[in-house]
A protein has these predicted regions:
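Periplasmic c-type cytochrome electron-transfer domains
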Residues: 1-190
Length: 190
């Protein structure tokens, strides 16, 4: 299998075999074509155990994807000026700045795990919210452009995308799932 072929990528997306990406594949002029793509939380908060080959294996939900370089991906946008592109490229693998698009201050942090959070107070990496749902809403609306709203007078953030709300109804189930993700057993001697 040629993993560098766009046709392979389309086939994997059609099979829902790419962690963190969801695609709609349709026949266009007799050829399978990716007509829509979306990003899920798993892009940053799941990885694989490399049991088959590097980057291929059993899915590990809640584990931070420290191989992912979100800044380099975002920097590919033709809408960015050179200075902003440079900031995104400075982050490196496994890091992300969830506030940069709002405050313009370059402050990347290591992508945190989404496991072992049951019973943790001030559960978000920034300490802003008490529940994971706070952060899930923040990321869904302010980072991923999800249809809904996020507002916090303490931080001055008030973002509304669209007139419908496709975020709120999904938050309870997502939070419940995240709270079931136990932290892995530490390696011996660590």
């Amino acid at each position: 299998i040629d993993l560098t072929s766009p046709d392979t990528t389309v086939a994997l997306l059609e099979l829902d075999a790419v962690i963190g990406l969801r695609g709609t594949v349709e026949a266009v002029n007799g050829r399978k074509t990716l007509t829509r793509v979306g990003v899920t939380c798993a892009l940053c908060h799941s990885t694989v155990d490399d049991s088959f080959a590097p980057g291929i294996g059993k899915r590990l939900d809640g584990w931070p994807n420290r191989d992912l370089n979100p800044g380099a991906i975002i920097a590919l946008s033709p809408a960015l000026d050179a200075g902003t592109r440079s900031v995104f490229n400075s982050w490196g693998k496994g890091k992300y700045d969830p506030r940069f698009n709002l405050d313009g201050i370059n402050g990347p942090q290591v992508i945190p795990p989404a496991y072992g959070l049951a019973g943790v107070a001030r559960i978000t990496t920034t300490g802003d919210g008490d529940e994971i749902a706070y952060w899930n809403r923040y990321v869904a609306v302010t980072q991923m452009g999800g249809h809904g709203s996020f507002s916090d007078s303490r931080t001055g953030v008030d973002v509304r995308n669209g007139t419908d709300d496709l975020v709120t109804s999904r938050l309870p189930a997502l939070q419940a799932y995240q709270l079931t993700l136990a932290a892995p057993t530490p390696p011996a001697g660590s």
